Amino acid sequence: MSSRPLAVLIGSPGAGKTTVGRALAERLGVDLLDTDAEIERRAGKTVSDIFVEDGEEAFRALEREVVAEALASHPGVVALGGGAILNEQTRADLAGHRVVYLEVEFADAAKRVGLDTARPLLLGNPRARLKALLRERLPIYQSLATLTVSTSEHTPEEAAELIAKELPAAGD
């Protein structure tokens, strides 16, 4: 079996990387490595707590380490955190991988990350921030993708099926 991922899923928060990743890994009979979950396991705290307690720089450094290891040696499906593609070295490391961009409409992403409910003012405007993130990152996601699948138009199972059909048969 290959020591590189069969597929690497990228996309914004709420795109369904973990959910589609689970469905795809199950369909292919391999493991899913969700880089955010691996970061939490290594740090012993949530991504949110890492950001608050240690800062974004510390989070991004740990994320870079986890992503580099996954891209070099995980033989299943890898789901990257939404911002992992901001790292130049990560973008370079993605070259030659089967990178699947999970595209999502803003309204669906907002709903999936819980921004469709009333929020206290002290949070600022998280919907505007999410919209800005989607707009800023879109060209990067598109430039890295070898395949794009809409998770607004397809269920996670349908998305996994579409991705699986595009992957080479085992041994190719």
From Swiss-Prot:
Chief location category: cytoplasm
Binding-site residues, ATP: G14, A15, G16, K17, T18, T19, R119
One Gene Ontology cellular component annotation held by this UniProt entry: cytosol
GO molecular function, one term: magnesium ion binding
Domain of life according to the entry: Bacteria
Keyword Glycoprotein (UniProt): no
Coiled-coil residue windows: none
Keyword terms of this UniProt record: Amino-acid biosynthesis, Aromatic amino acid biosynthesis, ATP-binding, Cytoplasm, Kinase, Magnesium, Metal-binding, Nucleotide-binding, Transferase
Pfam families attached to this UniProt entry: SKI
List of residues binding Mg(2+): T18
Residues engaged in binding substrate: D36, R60, G82, R137
InterPro entries according to UniProt: P-loop_NTPase, Shikimate/glucono_kinase, Shikimate_kinase/TSH1, Shikimate_kinase_CS
Cofactor note: Binds 1 Mg(2+) ion per subunit.
Catalysed reactions, as listed in the record: shikimate + ATP = 3-phosphoshikimate + ADP + H(+)
Gene3D superfamilies per UniProt: P-loop containing nucleotide triphosphate hydrolases (3.40.50.300)
Family: Belongs to the shikimate kinase family.
Subunit structure of this chain's protein: Monomer.
Role played: Catalyzes the specific phosphorylation of the 3-hydroxyl group of shikimic acid using ATP as a cosubstrate.
Protein name, UniProt field: Shikimate kinase
